[in-house]
């Protein structure tokens, strides 16, 4: 009988994008259960990775009552499944999963810090986020910062005195470098988006405040006034409820003739290949996949 491991994130998109291939590999040695909030991506994970999945509603923002309900559901799940390992990523799933796993006395409790929220906040919210990260660390048995910057902030803010295990130089999963080769097919698709001799800046990621989108758009609008032969390509979706951009930024994205909003794209290779420069003004990152891509 294989030992059981539960991998958990707040939203299914994290499992779908960040752990591609990893769950399938784990399933060769372990019985794997992937847990997150419900969504189409959770079904994709089950099919692609060949693992069981379970949907438990979790909120990314602070929601005390819903968080308590999610914690209780996780406790019930862990007692039913009796895993040997619970491994979480993303802040809210980390807090709830590590608490539930400790209550249920799961032997191995791992949390991967994929990026820290509190360094980009201030006041009472920062103190609350620091307290929740400290609680996550206290409940875990192993802590894995995604990158050197994350490890540095955990140490600088005295979040934990426990050992921090950085795998290699960081990153959560690595990427298939061959997949991002500039193959003839990728370059053929890139020609659809290329606008010679226009100079193209490209951003890939969530279009939210934390990713520096307000500053990026503002800087580009000013730049484009002086150098008209340039454009900005934005590949990703908004998160209006969780971390909205300013109304002025949103208006520029939708109406500025030199800003191309491409929305969510399953395959980002043609957009990267069509660009002259990649821009990534994020406030907080671990070791982001998109840089490797």
Range-by-range predicted roles:
Residues 7-66, 153-155, 163-166, 238-240:
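N-terminal strand-loop element at the rim of the active site
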Residues 88-94:
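Short His-centered aromatic/hydrophobic patch
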Residues 13-20, 65-72, 107-108, 117-139:
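Nucleotide-sugar donor phosphate/pyrophosphate-binding loop at the beta->alpha transition
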Residues 54-55, 134-186:
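Donor nucleotide-sugar binding/catalytic pocket of nucleotide-sugar-dependent glycosyltransferases
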Residues 16-21, 199, 203-222:
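A conserved mid-protein helix/loop that constitutes part of the nucleotide-sugar donor-binding site
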């Amino acid at each position: 009988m294989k030992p059981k491991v539960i991998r958990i994130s707040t939203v299914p998109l994290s499992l779908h994008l960040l752990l591609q291939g990893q769950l399938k590999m784990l399933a060769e040695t372990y019985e794997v259960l992937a847990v997150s909030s419900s969504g189409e991506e959770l079904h994709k994970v089950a099919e692609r990775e060949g693992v069981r999945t379970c949907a438990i509603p979790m909120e990314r923002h602070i929601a005390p009552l819903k968080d308590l309900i999610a914690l209780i559901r996780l406790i019930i799940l862990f007692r039913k499944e009796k895993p040997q390992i619970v491994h979480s990523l993303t802040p809210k799933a980390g807090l709830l999963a590590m608490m539930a796993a400790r209550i249920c006395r799961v032997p191995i409790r791992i949390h991967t810090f994929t990026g820290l929220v509190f360094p980009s906040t201030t006041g009472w919210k920062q103190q609350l986020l620091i307290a929740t990260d400290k609680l996550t660390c206290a409940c875990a048995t192993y802590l894995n910062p995604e990158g050197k910057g994350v490890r540095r902030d955990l140490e600088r803010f005295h979040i934990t005195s426990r050992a921090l295990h950085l795998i290699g130089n960081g990153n959560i999963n690595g990427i298939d470098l061959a997949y991002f080769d500039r193959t003839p097919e990728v370059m053929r698709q890139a020609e659809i988006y290329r606008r010679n001799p226009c100079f193209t800046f490209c951003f890939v990621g969530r279009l939210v405040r934390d990713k520096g989108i307000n500053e990026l758009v503002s800087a580009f609008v000013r730049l484009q006034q002086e150098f008209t032969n340039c454009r900005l390509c934005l590949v990703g979706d908004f998160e209006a409820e969780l971390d909205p951009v300013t109304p002025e930024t949103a208006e520029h994205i939708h109406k500025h003739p030199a800003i191309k909003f491409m929305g969510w794209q399953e395959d980002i290779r043609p957009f990267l290949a069509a660009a002259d420069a990649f821009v990534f003004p994020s406030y907080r990152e671990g070791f982001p996949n998109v840089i490797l891509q």
